[in-house]
């Protein structure tokens, strides 16, 4: 068991419990979706597991870091969908933000058309529905 302190309240959790499971217990206390946690001051993704006693704080989508994490996840989802539909030889450049959106340029031999846009949108929705995790992989 690990002792987890959240907002001054301590509770025992089994080692191996994910921060997502813990966040689900507290989500109703927050106006915005919990996106990340800090474990003893270090940012952790929700799929990470409890391994030791820790002081935990929740980061929501209304927090700057939570919003940036959400934005990066949306970009990765978009890039994956474009590559799945148009091929990996297509290059995607995230140029700048426009209001609450992002301007992205797709470069390569293949041209973007209405059908490609529909297929990319469908692929993104399918991946969201499948609840596929986004995981980090270290590269040398």
Give the role of each language-model region:
Residues 52-56:
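Loop/turn positions that initiate beta-strands
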Residues 33-48:
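Short acidic beta-strand-loop surface patches of small beta-rich interaction domains
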Residues 1-10:
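Eukaryote-biased recognition of intrinsically disordered, low-complexity regulatory segments
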Residues 15-19, 58-87:
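N-terminal catalytic cores of NTP/NDP-binding nucleotidyl/phosphoryl-transfer enzymes
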Residues 98, 107-140:
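Non-catalytic interaction/regulatory segments
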Residues 23, 76, 104:
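Divalent metal-coordination and catalytic microenvironments
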Residues 17-29:
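Short amphipathic, charge-patterned alpha-helical segments
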